[in-house]
Amino acid sequence: MIGLIGRKVGMTRVFNEDGVSIPVTVIEIEANRVTQVKTLENDGYSAIQVTTGTKKASRVTKPEAGHFVKAGVEAGRGLWEFRTEGEEFTLGQEINVDIFADVKKVDVTGTSKGKGFAGGVKRWNFRTQDATHGNSLSHRVLGSIGQNQTPGRVFKGKKMAGHLGAERVTVQSLEVVRVDAERKLLLVKGAVPGATNSNVIVKPAVKA
């Protein structure tokens, strides 16, 4: 089953039948319009390309505009692709949030909030060094980053200070709390990556 592109609206809470508060993220999923159907014969694999939302005509490049016109759909805020397995789709077809009506759990992919340059304590949850006992400068410093003449280098992948956030992150197996097809909303339990109004990709959970 394919996924859908949505917009992270924010977080709130809902109450179940027992009156228990459930923290949920609200994802607005407007109709996803099919802009291209890729086939095994023509493209080497089966997939559909979709768009959603709207974009000002002045913000659409000529190649993009031609692509949208060929598909017979309104220009959207981006293009995304989902692999297909036997499902039939047509150009211009609209796919709505109600495809998740019978789905129990979903995987949500987004771009995490950028935090800029961060030290090891914030970026990797390193513990801090002694506050006193002779330590006057190295309270939040990494400490040793390697050995001696052997191997004589710092290994690749060593956890160090650097850029934190602003990367693609997937949170798996989030419970679907509610599907509101009328208002085009999907409520999932817990937090999803990204800032408010950012694009997120919602797919049925692979581990469900």
From Swiss-Prot:
One of its GO terms (biological process) is translation. Keywords: Methylation, Ribonucleoprotein, Ribosomal protein, RNA-binding, rRNA-binding. The keyword tRNA-binding does not apply. The keyword Ribonucleoprotein applies. Methylated by PrmB. InterPro entries: Ribosomal_uL3, Ribosomal_uL3_bac/org-type, Ribosomal_uL3_CS, Transl_B-barrel_sf. One of its GO terms (cellular component) is cytosolic large ribosomal subunit. GO terms for molecular function: rRNA binding; structural constituent of ribosome. The modification N5-methylglutamine is found at Q149. Transmembrane segments: none annotated. Belongs to the universal ribosomal protein uL3 family. One of the primary rRNA binding proteins, it binds directly near the 3'-end of the 23S rRNA, where it nucleates assembly of the 50S subunit. PANTHER family: 50S RIBOSOMAL PROTEIN L3 (PTHR11229), LARGE RIBOSOMAL SUBUNIT PROTEIN UL3C (PTHR11229:SF16). Part of the 50S ribosomal subunit. Forms a cluster with proteins L14 and L19. This is Large ribosomal subunit protein uL3.
